[in-house]
Amino acid sequence: AYGIMIMLQNTDSVDILIVADPNEKFEERDKLFIDQYIMNGGKSLWCIDPVYANLDSLSNGFSTIAFERDLNLRDLLFRYGARLNADLLQDVVCMQYPVNTAPAGQATNWVPAPFYYSPLATPSPTHILSRNLNNVMVEFTSSIEAVGENSELRKSVILSTSPYARSIQTPVEVSLLSATNPPDQRFFNQPNIPIALLLEGKFQSAFQNRMTEQMGIQRSEVVKSSPDNKMIVIADGGIIKNKARVRNGQVQLQPLGYDQYSKQTFGNRDFLVNCIDYLSDDSGIMQLRSRVVKLRLLDKVKIRDQKIKWQLINT
């Protein structure tokens, strides 16, 4: 709490507060200083995993249990207009990871298989922040909702699933076997589930009616409403995290958004840079960058379902 207090006491010294994949509960005093930083005009980027699950947990076996992670942030983010849900998203448009398909006792046979818990998220094509970006690689991501009745806030979805996704409530068993024994794709009937929200306008303090003296601020000193401000909330903690690999006994960081299996680089870095530039009010750079058109992934579901139709047409 002391470090956060010192860092945020002078709003001018912190351009953007990035809350990147925290794994411990926030104390109320920490939340108060973050809240007052925002009420004084401070910009913020939240990358939060509301559910605990990761691939490392699967490295020691074929399955693990994903469960809700209590970071004590729900009331704060709810007050600002966002609710992170304790679910996991599956998407037909997803990453492929090597899976051993050999029977027990036989030589390993690694083949690429879709891992539905690692969606290739779609940036919104209608907002300058996310327009013309490549798909973004996420992993064990959750859904997010715009909430509240604050008429002074504008809420925009800037990242979502493909049209072929579904939400699974936790706790739930996560298994690598789903890659080799996939669920019926008719269950993937929830389109464009939001993953990231941009919130703009005047935020209301989560502490405006609370006793704050024991947390270091007199109640009369609590700023109750912010000036025009911005924040981004993402329901994925690892979206801005570089992946690492061990090679010759050395840990090597991969470029942000790079997938070592497909050798592709996805839009994570560009998405992060755009978030920072947008929060920094660098609209000129945003306008220029949004003119760059990049290739998008083909709709693999439609390709598969309509393959025979187009083969017949072209013969």
What are the residue ranges of the model-derived segments?
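A cross-kingdom feature of multi-pass membrane systems that activates on extracytoplasmic/periplasmic
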Residues: 289-299
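Acidic, S/T/G-rich, low-cysteine, solvent-exposed domains in lumenal/extracellular/periplasmic regions
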Residues: 1-284
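C-terminal signal-anchor/stop-transfer transmembrane helix together with its immediate cytosolic
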Residues: 297-315
